[in-house]
Each structure stands twice: as C-alpha cells, then as structure tokens.
Amino acid sequence: MNPIISAASVIAAGLSVGLAAIGPGIGQGSAAGQALEGIARQPEAEGKIRGTLLLSLAFMEALTIYGLVVALSLLFANPFTAS
C-alpha cells in the first residue's frame, strides 16, 4: 500500500469522527439544557419532555455513529487501495 494513501486514510478517519461529533455534541448539550429549563418551568410535563428528549438525543447520536462508520471503512475496508 502506498504510504501516502495510508497516512491520508488515518488522518481522514480521525477527522471524520472528530468533525462528526462536533455538531451532535453541541446539539445534545443545547437540547438537554432546554429540556431541563422546560422541566423547571413545568414539572408536571417531565415525562413527556424526557421522552421527547431521549428520542431526539438518539437521532443526534446517529450522526456521530455515521462518522464512526466512515472512519472504520477508511481504516479497514479502504476503497482507495487496490487489493
């Protein structure tokens, strides 16, 4: 394998996980903060807010998992090498 392709694949894998985690991390923090604020204002709506929060957190985390899948495919099933 060409060492330049190998090095670029490792760098791209790290960047894909890192960049894929930035947006969902910010979104999850914001969503959790807003949910806590909503629960503080209306404690009787805690169950509904918590359920909606957990569902939305799962959807946000899926974006990070897609970045991990891209990184793993670059590391172990690299499409840029001729095998």
Curated annotation (Swiss-Prot):
The chain crosses the membrane at residues 3-23, 57-77. Its main location: plastid. It is found in: Plastid, Chloroplast thylakoid membrane. The keyword Transmembrane applies. InterPro entries: ATP_synth_csu_bac/chlpt, ATP_synth_F0_csu, ATP_synth_F0_csu_DDCD_BS, ATP_synth_F0_csu_sf, ATPase_proteolipid_c-like_dom, F/V-ATP_Csub_sf. Keywords: ATP synthesis, CF(0), Chloroplast, Hydrogen ion transport, Ion transport, Lipid-binding, Membrane, Plastid, Thylakoid, Transmembrane, Transmembrane helix, Transport. It comes from the Eukaryota. The record marks E61 as: Reversibly protonated during proton transport. GO terms for molecular function: lipid binding; proton-transporting ATP synthase activity, rotational mechanism. One of its GO terms (cellular component) is proton-transporting two-sector ATPase complex, proton-transporting domain. It is a multi-pass membrane protein. The keyword Thylakoid applies. F-type ATPases have 2 components, F(1) - the catalytic core - and F(0) - the membrane proton channel. F(1) has five subunits: alpha(3), beta(3), gamma(1), delta(1), epsilon(1). F(0) has four main subunits: a(1), b(1), b'(1) and c(10-14). The alpha and beta chains form an alternating ring which encloses part of the gamma chain. F(1) is attached to F(0) by a central stalk formed by the gamma and epsilon chains, while a peripheral stalk is formed by the delta, b and b' chains. F(1)F(0) ATP synthase produces ATP from ADP in the presence of a proton or sodium gradient. F-type ATPases consist of two structural domains, F(1) containing the extramembraneous catalytic core and F(0) containing the membrane proton channel, linked together by a central stalk and a peripheral stalk. During catalysis, ATP synthesis in the catalytic domain of F(1) is coupled via a rotary mechanism of the central stalk subunits to proton translocation. Belongs to the ATPase C chain family. PANTHER family: ATP SYNTHASE LIPID-BINDING PROTEIN, MITOCHONDRIAL, ATPASE PROTEIN 9. In plastids the F-type ATPase is also known as CF(1)CF(0). This is ATP synthase subunit c, chloroplastic. The lineage of its organism: Eukaryota, Haptista, Haptophyta, Pavlovales, Pavlovaceae.
